[in-house]
Amino acid sequence: MNYGKEWAWMDNLENNNMGNKKWWIPGNVPSSKNGRRWTGKYFIASKAVMTYRKATKDIYAEYTEEFKKELENHELPVKISFEFVRGSRHKFDYLNPAQTVQDDMVKYGWIEDDNAEFIIPAFEQYTYNKENPGVWIEILSK
């Protein structure tokens, strides 16, 4: 699973009607909480999370500076919207895949931390697209 140039059909950075920029991260976002594995010493991420992170690391890295530049226009804590496009119709909790995305946003320097002093997460209604799952990330004005 590699989300490279074959995702060129969708512009990763898009402007919506309100003028806010949106960033597209392809791939069905797994829960970093569910499915953790015990090694005997500590927990490690599930295979699904490890596969997702390997497939999306270049995309997160590519948009780091652009996201940080946009973030400078907002006061902390910033309201960030997550719109999940699910690849299956399985039930899910918004918070679990959002935690995966927020962890990656911290890892790649999009945000300093994902605690309440830095981010107020918001959610749009999820949609379903078996061929093109992913998540839209948008910085909202307060």
Give short role names for the model-derived ranges.
Residues 2-142:
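Acidic, proline/glycine-enriched N-terminal capping motif
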